[in-house]
From Swiss-Prot:
Protein name, per record: Piercer of microtubule wall 2 protein
Any Gene Ontology CC annotation: axonemal A tubule inner sheath
Cross-referenced InterPro entries: PIRC1/2
Location, primary (coarse class): cytoplasm
Example GO biological process: axoneme assembly
Expression (tissue specificity): Expressed in airway epithelial cells.
Biased amino acid composition, Basic and acidic residues: 1-10
UniProt family annotation: Belongs to the PIERCE2 family.
Length: 121
């Protein structure tokens, strides 16, 4: 084999390389939400191990999975500490404020603690 033929073979693409490129699936074109931008066939996007059945990897959970597993005693709280209802019981006994809401406006009274902050409000 001459040097000229060797150069031609090394620069020409091999058949196996072109076959691999044609078999590759299209990638996710848009780098946004993979659920909406992935161009791969969803049927091929499954995960399966020897210990689990195949599952779709694009949609892992839905509302029917909530409460699927019963709680086990190891995860129960060890003690019960109820919250004090002092504020709620006071509102229940005395009623709401004048306009039936809580006072959430900032307090605009003059600050007398520190003379430099006295006229900042």
């Amino acid at each position: 084999m001459t040097d000229r033929n060797r150069d031609k073979k090394s620069t020409s693409p091999s058949n196996s390389d072109t076959e691999m490129k044609s078999e590759q699936l299209p990638p996710c074109v848009n780098p946004g939400n993979p659920v909406f931008s992935c161009m791969l066939d969803p049927k091929t996007l499954q995960t399966a191990t020897s210990l689990s059945k195949p599952q779709m990897i694009m949609y892992k959970t839905n509302s029917s999975h909530y409460g699927e597993f019963l709680p086990i005693p190891q995860f129960f709280p060890c003690n019960y500490t109820p919250k004090e209802q002092v504020f709620s019981s006071h509102i229940r006994a005395t009623g709401f404020y004048q306009n039936n809401t809580l006072n959430t406006a900032p307090d605009r009274t003059r600050t007398l603690d520190f003379p430099n902050i006295q006229h900042t409000l």
